[in-house]
Amino acid sequence: MARWKRETGGSDVAPRRRGVLATGFSWLLVIAWAAVIFSMSAQQSTGLSSGFTGQVREVAVGFLALLGLAPDSFSVICHFAEYLVFGALLANAFSCRLGLGKSFLLALVCASVYGAGDEFHQYFVPTRMCDPLDWLTDTLGAALGSFACVLALRRRR
C-alpha cells in the first residue's frame, strides 16, 4: 500500500493512464488557453473596450450593476474566471500521468507562475499595468479550478 501511494503521488486513487491522443489533446487545450490569456493581456486596455469585447463588457457590467456590484469587479471576475479554466485544464492534463494530489499541486504552481509572468508582461503593454492583486486573483481562480477538476476526476475513478 505504501508503494502504491508513493507511485500515485500520495493518493489512494490510481492515476488515469490515458492514451497518447487524449493526453496530447489535454495539453493542446492547455496551450490554447494559455495563448488566449496571453493575447488578452497583450491588448491595450482601450482595445478591450471596443468591438465585440466591449459589447460583452457592457452587458456584463450592466448585469453586475443589477447584482449591486461595482463595475470595477468585472476585471476581477474575468481574471478569476480565466484562471479557473486554466487551473482545471492543467489539473486534467497532469492527471493523465500523475496522481490527483500531484496534479492539483502542479496545476496550481504552474498557473500561479504563468499568472505572475502574465502580470509582468502587462507591465510592457501600453495602458496596462502589473498588479499583484490580479496575480493573487489568478492564483485563487486556478486553485478553485484545479481543485474542482481533481474532485470531478476522483468521482470518475
Predicted feature residues:
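Bulky hydrophobic segments
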Residues: A2-F124, P132-L133, T139, A143-R157
